[in-house]
């Protein structure tokens, strides 16, 4: 989605719910990447615990992707499909999306990812 503003919409919420990250962890990662102020409505200790959890998950995720590539389960076609999905979701970030459009995008995205994850 690039470095622009990320809108919290139905599609993004769906993706976060099914990801390995909580919405708070995603928020911390995003703000750190952008260089935005870090501690907001939480103690410094809680923030740094959340940051460590987020980093650990990201670290593990990158190793998992590497492992899947080595095993041939994350090939070029899979990368291309994920890239197209990412670009389509990025388009929904440019303007307000009607509820029926969001549901359709979510349905298609979920179906594609389910097919890709069959082992």
Predicted regions and their residues:
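Short, Lys/Arg-enriched N-terminal segment that forms or immediately precedes the first helix
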Residues: 2-18
